[in-house]
Amino acid sequence: MTYRYFYDCEFIEDGRTVDLVSIGVVDEYGREFYAVSTEFDGARAVPWVRRNVLEKLPSPGNPAWRSRERIRDELYDFLVEPVRGRAGEELELWAWYAAYDHVALAQLWGPMTALPREIPRFTKDLRQLWDDRGRPVLPDASGRHDALVNARHNLARWDVLRTP
């Protein structure tokens, strides 16, 4: 059986590095994970990211703010908990324009070779699936550039796209 996760990352990138700002993850059963990194360098953000991402983050006193190490450990537990000890179960990761999201997620463990074996080495792309399905009408997005809101929206997209 496949256990699917839908996620989104907000990040700062400069062509050389992808610096995680926040990550939101939801599954098909209502479980959610949200975290904001205490370690991103906001000074490197372009004005658009400052305005559309950083200014919309929860206040620094919010418990969503965590170190990258804590995000990594808690995200791992969140992802593997439903399949732990269940032979034949595998995880799927889904995102919209998934490439950078996967890099931001995988870099929580450092080099790609350090990614735990339970976590997929790639993220399936909802945007590509949308093209493959003939671009059907999708639910409207709200709260853009909020990782958890976007992850929920990715699940709503999946609900439309999962059947041809």
Could you tell me what each predicted segment is?
Residues 117-137:
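Short, flexible loop segments at boundaries between secondary-structure elements
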Residues 93-98, 104, 136-164:
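Acidic, Mg2+-coordinating catalytic module of metal-dependent nucleases/exonucleases
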Residues 15-17, 31-34, 108, 132, ...:
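Active-site-proximal flexible loops/turns
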Residues 2-96, 141:
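Conserved non-catalytic scaffold segment of RNase H-like nuclease domains
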Residues 69-73, 77, 124-127, 149, ...:
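Short, contiguous clusters of charged residues that form electrostatic/catalytic patches at enzyme active sites
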Residues 100-120:
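Substrate-recognition/cap helix-loop segment adjacent to the acidic, metal-dependent catalytic center
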